[in-house]
Swiss-Prot record:
Function: Removes the 2'-phosphate from RNA via an intermediate in which the phosphate is ADP-ribosylated by NAD followed by a presumed transesterification to release the RNA and generate ADP-ribose 1''-2''-cyclic phosphate (APPR>P). May function as an ADP-ribosylase.
Gene: kptA
Cited NCBIfam families: PRK00819.1-4
BP-aspect Gene Ontology terms: tRNA processing; tRNA splicing, via endonucleolytic cleavage and ligation
Provenance organism: Pseudomonas aeruginosa (strain ATCC 15692 / DSM 22644 / CIP 104116 / JCM 14847 / LMG 12228 / 1C / PRS 101 / PAO1)
Assigned keywords, A-Z: NAD, Transferase
Protein name: Probable RNA 2'-phosphotransferase
Pfam annotation, one family: PTS_2-RNA
Length: 182
């Protein structure tokens, strides 16, 4: 399977499994799961050729582990990053490491300094335990800036953290007082 096919399919899956399942007539359950046969049929109606082998390759080879297959192999979901109102994955609370990181573009700094980190259209703010990963995310949006989050103090102050299956740390918001430009 060539890299371009995997990347294009990953982008398509991110769109329909995180944000717009209706675009192909797909229904997600409350945990974000979609029936694979319905996904394949919806993609075909949209002019996209998907099959179980391609979906398995995307799940297996995605460097950020964005997708998961159910134990029975009949369903697929994005593990985090949802903006769809019907999806509310019940992540277990987790104790974060002392410091987490968030990558952003410099053009967003004024808003972050004023409001902190907010999820925007997503359900959660996404954080990383690795500086390099956070910087990579920031590069997608422009000139990258690395923010250091005092996750220990934030957690002690009562803010909940969760860790998605792919290792991404999630929280509802990050108040300004817990953010430092690294």
């Amino acid at each position: 399977m060539d890299r371009k096919t995997l990347d294009d399919t990953s982008k398509f899956l991110s769109y329909v499994l995180r944000h717009q399942p209706e675009a192909i007539g797909l229904t997600l359950d409350g945990e974000g799961w979609a029936d694979i046969d319905a996904l394949i049929a919806g993609a075909a109606r949209d002019g996209r050729a998907l099959d179980r082998m391609l979906l398995g390759a995307v799940v297996e080879n995605n460097d950020k582990k964005r997708f998961a297959l159910s134990a029975d192999g009949q369903r697929i979901r994005a593990v985090q990053g949802h903006s769809h109102a019907a999806v509310a994955i019940a992540y277990a609370p987790a104790v974060p490491p002392a410091v987490l990181y968030h990558g952003t573009a410099s053009r967003f700094l004024d808003s972050i300094r004023e409001r902190g980190l907010v999820p925007g259209s997503r359900h959660h703010v996404h954080l990383s335990a690795r500086r390099a990963t956070a910087l990579e995310v920031g590069r997608r949006y422009g000139s990258p800036v690395l923010l250091e989050i005092d996750a220990r103090d934030m957690h002690l102050a009562g803010h909940l953290f969760h860790q998605a299956e792919n290792g991404v740390w999630l929280t509802e918001r990050v108040p300004v007082r817990f953010i430092r430009e690294a």
